[in-house]
Amino acid sequence: MELTQPIRENGDPQGHQLTDPDAEVVSLSPRTLLESDRYVCEICNQGFQRDQNLQMHRRRHKVPWKLLKRDKKDEEVRKRVYVCPEPTCLHHDPCHALGDLVGIKKHFRRKHSVHKQWVCERCSKGYAVQSDYKAHLKTCGSRGHSCDCGRVFSRVESFIEHQDTCTIRQPQPTNHRHLQQHTMGLDAPSRTTSTASFGPLLHGLPLLRPPRPSNQHSPAFAYPFNASSAPFESLELQLSIGMARTSAQARHNEKRETSLTKERANEEARKAEETRQEAKRQIEMAEKDFEKAKRIREEAKTELEKAHVVREEAIKRINATMMEITCHSCKQLFQLPVTADESTSSLVMSYVSSATTEGECE
């Protein structure tokens, strides 16, 4: 099936037909589309959003060329197009798939993601795409592209897309064209000085000779005032007042939302500070407990060393006593209480048996 490349996110109205009819349609999960780093370097584990940036990064590593060289199979990869995982989205249809991975990720973040990672410090507006946030910073504080509902857009394509769906747009006055025609109709008779227009006013009187044409035109206020233009002027005045009220109300609503957002941000910052202080106190208590346990461990270690020294001295005394014993009956008497202690029985019995053997030999 032959696929066509849809309208891009930057508002390009020209769709281009894919030259490769065997393009592979790829449908990524929302979790994959929300990942910030899609391509990871296998040497230093650094992530990149584009494959081109990863290839340029690999050149910085001083590794043999064989590791950077691609196989022929990798070069003959089919072209891929990406569809949106949302079933109700236009780009979910393969005929409207996007031909760039970065484009589909920006589209999903911009249209279907709720998490606004980048927030403007001046107006507290959040953006899910970093490029949109940077474009907003360039025009934040200026008028930019303002809609009749009070919203201001930094991108032309976003402003046009909003106007297609905005329901608070200012209605065009229907009598504006009639007002222009009426004004033109008032100006048209002023350019002529024919006396025919005064015929009904001079009924029953002899006609006067028309005055000689002169190069100077009479001023516009010399003609009689037409009362029919008054309703149009009042209508235009009412429309201007209505537009001013709508814009003022929109600005008031925007200021109120900004103040509420700032209050919520301050409350969250206060809670975060309290949590940080509590964590700091817990860390200090844990450090004190650790120092106490460390001191107790050192004391126990010292006591254990002293016990080892006492044990060594006792063993030395036992050995010296065994060497002094020469009577066989005394050895038997000394052997009875020693066997009661199971911890030193093996050591004492070895010395007793050796001493007994030496006495019998003598």
From Swiss-Prot:
Chain coiled-coil ranges: 252-319
GO MF annotation, one: DNA-binding transcription factor activity
Cellular compartments annotated: Nucleus
Induction trigger: Not regulated by auxin.
SMART domains cross-referenced by the UniProt entry: ZnF_C2H2
Xref: InterPro entries: C2CH-3rd_BIRD-IDD, C2H2-2nd_BIRD-IDD, IDD1-16, Znf_C2H2_sf, Znf_C2H2_type
One cellular component (GO) term of this entry: nucleus
Region span, SHR-binding: 155-167
Residues engaged in binding Zn(2+) 2: C147, C149, H162, C166
Keywords: Coiled coil, DNA-binding, Metal-binding, Nucleus, Repeat, Transcription, Transcription regulation, Zinc, Zinc-finger
Chain segments carrying region Disordered: 1-22, 247-278
ZnF CCHC-type span: 118-142, 145-168
Pfam families, per database record: C2CH-3rd_BIRD-IDD (PF22995), C2H2-2nd_BIRD-IDD (PF22996)
Tissue spec: Highly expressed in leaves, hypocotyls, roots, vasculature of cotyledons, floral organs and in the endodermis and vasculaturenof inflorescence stems.
PANTHER family associated with the record: PROTEIN INDETERMINATE-DOMAIN 16, SERINE/THREONINE-PROTEIN KINASE RIO
Function: Transcription factor regulating lateral organ morphogenesis and gravitropic responses. Has a redundant role with IDD14 in directing leaf and floral organ morphogenesis. Acts cooperatively with IDD15 to control silique and branche orientation. Involved in the establishment of auxin gradients through the regulation of auxin biosynthesis and transport.
Entry protein name: Protein indeterminate-domain 16
Source organism of the structure: Arabidopsis thaliana (Mouse-ear cress)
Lineage start: Eukaryota, Viridiplantae, Streptophyta, Embryophyta, Tracheophyta
